[in-house]
């Protein structure tokens, strides 16, 4: 009997569903826009009823409740996304599909996928896109006590050239996400990020903020590498700008385990597939435990 694994990337703008064979090769994939919880969850249930799998890995936007002893385990909790606050995502899926579901954050899933693809068991994954999130793995396991990390909302030093910008985070204003996520570019300049020229000074400002997040991760978690994904990182030369800022900020305080080019890097899984691969392996971990 063939074994198949499912992946759900539950994003704030789109859901990506995928099926893999027992060797983690994608055999089917389906994307659709994230709309209302009812419509979006119904589409997901329909897909997996038509494409049966043994277990599902689910990486979701958040915040989410990962505390297994909590009454709201499996919920999307205090999200700013309209209509999605306090939605029992896992509960609805499990009731309809009756299969094991491994629930974690979207960035944790990406971190896990990168770990499996590279063999590196101590890493941090930061995604810089519509929002900012971070996942970390130490010795092959996710970090976190009763919940998950919220690296996107860490406090950072403001760039001296834009002290008047209040930030866009609805909770904290000028946290990392508030000043460095994709929408902050348009809020500051009035221009969509993808239309801003590569030599605009705004990219130096963004790299200054993202490099601070990399410094914080380095000094608190001591990973083997930091992986930067998300739409903002698709800008040409963005990674090199961040690497230069990082080296300047670190100021030779500690030795890195490798060159900065290998230490701060882009994802190794092609076509934004880190989370999908991670979800497959997380589903596998549940299936083999059953």
UniProtKB/Swiss-Prot annotation:
Which SUPFAM superfamilies would you find in this protein's record?
Actin-like ATPase domain
Q: Which CDD domains match?
A: ASKHA_NBD_ROK_BsFRK-like
| Reactions accelerated catalytically | D-fructose + ATP = D-fructose 6-phosphate + ADP + H(+)
Q: What is its EC number?
A: 2.7.1.4
Q: Which Pfam families match?
A: ROK
Q: Which residues are Zn(2+)-binding?
A: 153, 169, 172, 175
Q: Which UniProt keywords apply?
A: ATP-binding, Carbohydrate metabolism, Kinase, Magnesium, Metal-binding, Nucleotide-binding, Transferase, Zinc
Q: Which cysteines are joined by disulfide bonds?
A: none
> What is the name listed in the Swiss-Prot or TrEMBL entry for this protein?
Fructokinase
Organism encoding this protein = Lactococcus lactis subsp. cremoris
């Amino acid at each position: 009997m063939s074994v198949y694994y499912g992946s759900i990337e539950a994003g704030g703008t789109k859901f990506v569903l995928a099926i893999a064979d027992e060797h983690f090769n994608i055999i089917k994939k389906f994307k659709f826009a994230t709309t209302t919880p009812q419509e979006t969850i119904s589409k997901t249930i329909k897909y997996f009823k038509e494409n049966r799998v043994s277990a599902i890995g689910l990486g979701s936007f958040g915040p989410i409740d990962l505390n297994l002893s909590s009454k709201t385990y499996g919920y999307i909790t205090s999200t700013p996304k309209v209509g999605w606050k306090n939605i029992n995502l896992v509960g609805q899926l499990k009731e309809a599909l009756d299969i094991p579901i491994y629930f974690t954050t979207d960035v944790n899933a990406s971190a896990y996928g990168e770990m499996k693809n590279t063999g590196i068991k101590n890493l941090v994954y930061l995604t810089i896109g519509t929002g900012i999130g971070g996942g970390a793995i130490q010795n092959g396991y996710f970090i976190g006590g009763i919940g998950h990390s919220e690296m996107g909302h860490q406090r950072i030093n403001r760039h001296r050239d834009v002290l008047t910008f209040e930030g866009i985070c609805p909770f904290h204003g000028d946290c990392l996400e508030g000043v460095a996520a994709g929408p902050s570019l348009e809020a500051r300049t009035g221009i969509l990020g993808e239309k801003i020229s590569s030599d605009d000074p705004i990219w130096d400002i963004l790299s200054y903020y993202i490099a601070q997040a990399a410094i914080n991760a380095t000094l608190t978690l001591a990973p083997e590498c930091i992986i930067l994904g998300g739409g903002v990182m698709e800008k040409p030369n963005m990674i090199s700008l961040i690497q230069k800022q990082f080296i300047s900020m670190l100021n030779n305080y500690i030795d890195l385990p490798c060159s900065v080019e290998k230490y701060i890097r882009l994802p190794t899984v092609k076509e934004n597939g880190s989370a999908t691969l991670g979800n497959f392996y997380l589903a596998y971990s549940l299936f083999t435990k059953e």
